[in-house]
Structure formats: structure tokens, C-alpha cells
Amino acid sequence: MTFLLLLLFCFLSPAISSAHSIPSTLDGPFVPVTVPLDTSLRGQAIDLPDTDPRVRRRVIGFEPEQISLSLSSDHDSIWVSWITGEFQIGKKVKPLDPTSINSVVQFGTLRHSLSHEAKGHSLVYSQLYPFDGLLNYTSGIIHHVRITGLKPSTIYYYRCGDPSRRAMSKIHHFRTMPVSSPSSYPGRIAVVGDLGLTYNTTDTISHLIHNSPDLILLIGDVSYANLYLTNGTSSDCYSCSFPETPIHETYQPRWDYWGRFMENLTSKVPLMVIEGNHEIELQAENKTFEAYSSRFAFPFNESGSSSTLYYSFNAGGIHFVMLGAYIAYDKSAEQYEWLKKDLAKVDRSVTPWLVASWHPPWYSSYTAHYREAECMKEAMEELLYSYGTDIVFNGHVHAYERSNRVYNYELDPCGPVYIVIGDGGNREKMAIEHADDPGKCPEPLTTPDPVMGGFCAWNFTPSDKFCWDRQPDYSALRESSFGHGILEMKNETWALWTWYRNQDSSSEVGDQIYIVRQPDRCPLHHRLVNHC
């Protein structure tokens, strides 16, 4: 027995030692740290050209391409999406007939026996610009099929397409999420924002794949098609380069390039997306979000939402809430009412972890987009806090920042940890200036989000100023580097967050911390707070 105990101690001691070397939120709040800027890292923010073989069409006829997976509301169902046929772009375009080809997924637990079949629906969307000299776009046929009745934590093989046309994909596979319980979680959840399709993006995805995620969260700003004119001319700053255009144009083929580049990953690992400002894509008749809402499948119906712009889902013992910053969010809005109902239904004995995501951050100390989402914060922060939100992921700011636990700008041991992860690699390059740097505090009236409007960013700092004169207390760590993060739930109270930088080796850590829930110290406040 003594020998067995000694052997067990020797086996566990490296893990214990390693765990002790990683800080936890129990050690906080932390003194704010700024990692000095490495000026050599701003290059490579250049989009892949349409001649790159990774973005070119590699199928013929109506064979499926741009295959992707997304979760439904729980472990027993999943969405499979793909595109068939070729997009059209020109002054006059004629949409393909979505009823001309079937939407079928054949699947099973054995690669050589795909004995089950599911059918879904198909659609096309158009991006129309009724102005002289501008080109219109209509997509290939987009298919969405929901597979149901799946077993948890199980590998399934599948192929998609139309078997009657002999237009089927090769066989792919995915693993379903574990059942919702306090003891079962996805192995690794990759988190990335503001991805785009640059050479930096390729580095981000290469590093991300090395970490073998079971699920991917993309926190807005996907293809950056709206940095292009309809003829394919591009710029890092659309408004600077094209101030005279009659409407903010887009080049929709960039979405197809993005889907092709990502297929090797998204055909195996579910991708959950929330919209960013680059997905708005205004067109004729004031239509918005057409590409975003058409190309991805969302569990909005399953989660009681009426919009692709906000929804929720479970992944094991985690309840994820994906919120829309570019649709009404005030306390009289449909989204706010939906959020109240969604949070009220969460059973923390089944899904102990509550993780929220939306695009523009509430807690960021960079000059870029500083306090831009203050009105959303005023509307929703108390509600999310009262239901004990554990972690919040945001993008929009092209850098990395992790907060101390915070609520209403005050350090609070029961507040969420806010993580800005808008460093995926897009062509607008990194954010490098901080609002507390001398001369870098923006003019207050320039900060409100131009889409939702309104000004809510009143003075709030200890010296009653718009900006801090030092790195804010809520900011634990900030660094301007491209990268991605990995979230690993260890149990119902401990989660490991790791941030990886593109310039490092795939296994080198840029930031790492255990995020620890304290349900005994931080009981839920929703019965004490009036949200009427």
C-alpha cells in the first residue's frame, strides 16, 4: 500500500506543481500589466489573393463546398451546412433555383455504413446595389440540414449533398458534445475574433488546429468583405479610401474564399459565430446581415430567439449566450426580453458555467473603440451580473486584454472575467494605442457606436475623467499581438484559460490563468434585483 501511495504521489506531483505555477482568479485582483509592443509584428496583415489555391473553388458542378458544422441547442443535434453551384457577380445576375437540388446528409457511427439520412432546406441570397457602375452578387445554393437523435460524446461520420445527382461530398466526421451535466465538458474550446483572411489569419488557424479544439467560438468580424468595392478593389480603411461611394460596398466573393479556406477545420469542428460590425453589409432596401444570416446555421429557433443575431446553446455543462450588439438591446427590446427568459431557464446544477459573448467590448483600455458599447453595457450589465455570468468574450479591438473580475467599473470578486480576443489577424492590423497613454484619450463625442447611436459614456474614473491616467484597475493584462485562446473546463468551478500568440511556437503560452467560480461566495442575485 505504501508503495502504491508513493507511486501515486510521483504520478500526480508534476500536475500539482504545474497547477501551482499557474495563477488563478483567487489570487487576484492582479496589478495591471502591459506587455511592451513588438513593432515587428504588424506586418502580414495582407489578404490572401483570389489566386491562392486555398481559396479557389476545388469542386465541379454541384458538388458540395464550404462545408461547416454548428451546434444546435444541445448535444443530441447538430447543423451541417454547405454550398453548391457557383456564385454570380455582375450588373445583371439571376439567382440559382434552391429547389433544383436536394439537401441531404447521410451519417452514422461507422465510416463504411452511413445508415441514417437527414434532409434540410436550401436558399440563395443576393447583395444588390442599384447604382451606376456597381456590381451585384448572388450566392450559390446554401444548404442547412439539422441532424437529430445523436448520442453524446460520440464520433459520427457523414457526407452531404444530393445523392440523386451523384453530387456528394467526401466522408467527414465530427464528435458530438457531451451531455449537459456538471461533470462533463468539451475538451477544448477555441475562441477567436476579428479573423478575416490574411496571412496572419493563416497563422492563427494553424496554431488553433494544433490545439485540437472540440468547439470554436468566433466573436464577430468574419470575412471583411466590406473592405472591398464590388469590383474587388480593397483598402485597410474603406471610409478613408472610398469616401465618395454612394453606399458602403462589399465584395461578396470574399465570403466564398473564407468558407473554402476554413472548410478543412469547420467540416470537423462546430463553429459558433456572433455578428460583428463588418457583417452589417447594408444593401438595397436597407437589408443588412444577409451573408451572415444565410451562410451560417444558428440555433436561434431552438433557443427561443427570433433572430440570427442573438441565441444560446449548451455544450456539456456550459450555457453559452451569444448577444447582438447591432440590433436593439435596450430594456424594452425583444433581445433584452429574450435574454431575461433565457437566463431564467438556466439550471446551474446542470450547466454550472455561464459564458456570454458579443462583439464590441465593455471593458477595454485601448483607444480603438474605447467605450463605444457603453449604451449596451448600461442596458445589459446588471442583468448578466445578477445571473452570475462567469466569463465574457469580446472582439472588435484588434489586440488581447484580460480583465480582473469587474462590475460597473469596480473590482468585484463576483463579477465576470472579460476577455478581449479581437486579435485573429484581420487586415486592419493591431490596436496598439491605449486610452491612458498621454494624448491618446479619444474625444468623448467620437466614441458612440455609429450603428446603434446614443451617448452613454459619462465620466467614471477615480479622478472623474473620461479616461484613466494609468492602466485601469480592471485591466489585468493587455498585449498587442495576434493569436487565439483555448478554454478548458476542468470541473464545475475551475476552468483553464490559455492565450497563444502567433509569433510563438504552437505550444508556447502567452497568458494563462485558472478562472474559478465561487458559487458559495457569490450567490445568484437575480431574485434580489428588479429588472422590470
Curated annotation (Swiss-Prot):
Binding site for substrate: N277, H396, V397, H398
Protein name: Purple acid phosphatase 15
Coiled coil: none
Keywords (A to Z) from UniProt: Glycoprotein, Hydrolase, Iron, Metal-binding, Secreted, Signal, Zinc
Iron found in the keyword field: yes
Family label: Belongs to the metallophosphoesterase superfamily. Purple acid phosphatase family.
Quaternary structure annotation from Swiss-Prot or TrEMBL: Homodimer.
Active site (record annotation): H369 (proton donor)
Catalytic activity: 1D-myo-inositol hexakisphosphate + H2O = 1D-myo-inositol 1,2,3,5,6-pentakisphosphate + phosphate; a phosphate monoester + H2O = an alcohol + phosphate
Tissue: Expressed in roots, stems, cotyledons, leaves, flowers and siliques.
